[in-house]
């Protein structure tokens, strides 16, 4: 085989195909037959399949020339073959075929040993992002600026010096890179300078402190050397670094100082710009909170992300924001802000500060923060938070998490089991029920009502005779305890409900029932006087309330006088026909069905005072008055909102409803509570 020409050994950067063929021919010459080498007096080559044959060490990455010629390369640079060919000045690692998910990655990032080939890690400035403009952003002249002396090791900023305008007294402004997490305390202060009147936004090294929060081209952001992890992929190591950066929030610091994103000293990036900070100017200081953010951003939740508040001697503060309201991968929130729930460890997010410290003052702090994003939230000072945290017992591995939602209601059962000293007097309750029936029903309906009451009233009296006072007190305790459970259940449902005793006295209702009928709970329970004049016109016109004396229940001589306003009875909330149907259903289900429940259609009377009744009569008498439609749509009136719900039954004073109710019993199998779910019939009520 003829030797290659002399021109092939020229250090030309252009690799031609004839050069690759010559290098392949050279390999064939080196791997000649044993007979050819033995004739020259050399040791014959071993068989390629011989296991004792010495193997060539495989290189991590072939150079560009050996890769094109498909030759075995070495790890040294320049490699042996390029030195032999005279191409040592152009020997560099070849580029492997990219995977689909790495098509957008630069070629330099895929090189082994990123620190020697990626331009930004050599100290050169990276190319500005497309979103950054090159125009000048005017800035109002601030007060005196102070620089800080470096403390500890820090990442070397770009070596290219950017000229800045000279300040007063011939002192120049330092162009050091500002860290992402400024320190909490600043012990050293440099000479005061004045910032320039305008700063070019297209200089990434100059405006690094206002750039993206997570710069994928900054390996020092994640506090380790990516090239030393031997991942073989820069972006794969970057992903692991991001996971480590986020998981660092669960590690509590060893001291009371702040913990930055890398859990090291805050000055690892070098000195930064301090906004008008100095002992002689305390009003223009820029304090930093324990989450390594400026106090302006700590106290003002509405401040944008990636903004730096610089307090001036004047009352105004200049906010430099180049990220706007963007929340993408370049201008996203802090890694510690991913979990907004409370935590027992110190975090670095203003929105995720220790929620347990604000539990008594503001239990819905997180919900209020998201509901009022444009309004500032009051925050306690870091010193106060650390003081409260120091007084707490040491935290364990398992701690209960305090949710920011509706917490479980504390049940005070002591007032039930220790406060009830006497039973409820059902004798007075049924006497009031008979009096209400005489006032509400006509003669024909009153006879039916008395018949329904006689079906279960004697049975209740006979069972009561077998119970002593302690049994009756225990029965009342069970009633109040069941009532507490029912109230907790009904608060989770938006259905209007009503709870009464077996004698009809109201014991509880919810706000939906008040919206539907106008009856407030204080009036129903007898805490306020009942001023209702809407009786439903149940009696006939020729009858008076005191027409006969034989139908009224006589007063018993041994009873105590009434002390206070009694509770409203359930049949007082219905018209005569609906109340009679209720008494009929209760008489049938009181003893016959152990799990008695029924449903009926009823007209509930709205709560109307004398003033309300006069106003309605005046509106009816006015011929020019036209009733307004509640909600006008193509299909007719549609119920919408609480205001429309309050207008149900405004014309005739009755709300057409569907009632589903069931009976709650005690341990003696006696009916004690009647639970009613009231739902309005909207198609009729809104016409």
Curated annotation (Swiss-Prot):
Example GO biological process: gluconeogenesis
Region (Disordered): 1-56, 150-214, 300-411, 536-561
SMART domains in the record: GAL4 (SM00066)
Compositional bias annotation for Low complexity: 195-212, 342-357
Domain PAS: 482-553
Polar residues: bias regions: 32-45, 150-159, 169-179, 300-318, 362-384, 392-402, 546-561
DNA-binding region extent: 63-91
Location, primary (coarse class): nucleus
Cellular compartment(s): Nucleus
Gene Ontology annotations for the cellular component aspect, listed alphabetically: nucleus
One Pfam family in the UniProt entry: PAS_13
Keywords: Activator, DNA-binding, Gluconeogenesis, Metal-binding, Nucleus, Transcription, Transcription regulation, Zinc
MF (Gene Ontology): DNA-binding transcription factor activity; DNA-binding transcription factor activity, RNA polymerase II-specific; RNA polymerase II transcription regulatory region sequence-specific DNA binding; zinc ion binding
PANTHER family xrefs: TRANSCRIPTION ACTIVATOR OF GLUCONEOGENESIS ERT1, ZN(II)2CYS6 TRANSCRIPTION FACTOR (EUROFUNG)-RELATED
Family assignment from sequence similarity: Belongs to the ERT1/acuK family.
Purpose: Transcription factor which regulates nonfermentable carbon utilization. Activator of gluconeogenetic genes.
UniProt-recorded name of the protein: Transcription activator of gluconeogenesis SNOG_12336
Organism from which the protein derives: Phaeosphaeria nodorum (strain SN15 / ATCC MYA-4574 / FGSC 10173)
